């Protein structure tokens, strides 16, 4: 079989298995009539078992595909890119943290202008009282998105699609796939996607657009780190626990609406501006191109 055709078939198979298994598992509690009112990754109810296992499908499927379809050198390199940072990784992590903090600031300034309450910062307050809470939030923050998804989305999927001359198209495609993969979350009352859809279905659909704009930032960090997946874990972590998570909770309904628009605009602006810098262009030139398929 032609290697290009083989790569395409493997890619399509990965997407079909990942999306269908996630949807099957995360819709199963509703099919079984289980109580999902408070279900989340950390709720410890029976429905959360299906919810959690469904959520790890991108990573689980991606790792299996790497083990099955990559050469031994490819497997070693995959693990190294996931767990061993380089200088670019550290720069990408700092840029990610800075971008997310600016997005929080802008979102809250707009929200306050619209009459919203101040942010609660309960997570930060808990850490200030007991620093051990830092590890609690770090644990749930890492497994609730970074580890459960990014070995697949940015590890395997981006590996298969990476083309230096088509990074914009690739990023938007991955972001769209990533967005629709979240479909079951619209039906779980404890998830912010459910809140958005209840406020306005259009707002719920804009979440997919926000995934596409976020994917532009993810790809930028991926390039800066010379295709390391390591810093992507932190970008996803920062978005989960800072932008709309425990560090700033509770936040107003106004904030939860405004943040969607701010994230889309600022992520897009970051991509447009940063990808025109000499720093990024040099990183792109140095980013390795490889294909480890057997």
PLM feature spans:
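Transmembrane alpha-helix/helix-exit interface in multi-pass inner-membrane proteins
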Residues: 104-113, 149-150, 169-191
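Specific transmembrane helices
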Residues: 2-146, 174, 244-294
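Alpha-helical transmembrane segments and their helix-entry boundary regions
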Residues: 11-15, 92-93, 156, 170-171, ...
């Amino acid at each position: 079989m032609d290697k290009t055709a083989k790569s395409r078939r493997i890619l399509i198979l990965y997407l079909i298995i990942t999306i269908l298994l996630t949807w099957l598992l995360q819709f199963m509690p509703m099919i079984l009539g289980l109580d999902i009112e408070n279900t989340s990754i950390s709720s410890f109810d029976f429905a959360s078992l299906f919810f959690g296992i469904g959520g790890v499908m991108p990573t689980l499927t991606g790792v299996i595909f790497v083990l099955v379809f990559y050469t031994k050198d490819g497997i070693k390199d995959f693990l190294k890119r996931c767990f061993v940072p380089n200088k670019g990784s550290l720069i990408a992590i700092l840029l990610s943290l800075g971008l997310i903090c600016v997005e929080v600031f802008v979102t809250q300034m707009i929200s306050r202008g619209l009459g919203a309450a101040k942010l609660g910062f309960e997570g930060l307050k808990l850490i200030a009282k007991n620093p051990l809470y830092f590890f609690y939030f770090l644990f749930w923050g890492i497994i609730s998105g970074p580890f459960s998804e990014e070995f697949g989305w940015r590890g395997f999927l981006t590996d298969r699609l990476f083309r230096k001359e088509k990074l914009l198209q690739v990023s938007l495609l991955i972001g769209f796939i990533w967005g629709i993969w979240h479909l079951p979350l619209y039906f779980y009352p404890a998830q912010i996607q459910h809140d958005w859809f209840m406020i306005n279905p259009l707002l719920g659909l804009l979440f997919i657009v926000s995934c596409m704009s976020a994917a532009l930032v993810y790809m930028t960090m991926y390039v800066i780190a010379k295709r390391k997946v390591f810093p992507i874990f932190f970008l996803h972590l920062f978005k989960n626990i800072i932008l709309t998570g425990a560090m700033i909770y509770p936040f107003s309904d106004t904030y939860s609406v405004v943040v969607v628009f701010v994230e889309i605009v600022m992520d897009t602006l970051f991509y447009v501006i940063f990808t025109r810098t000499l720093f990024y262009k040099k990183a792109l030139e140095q980013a390795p191109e490889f294909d480890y398929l057997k």
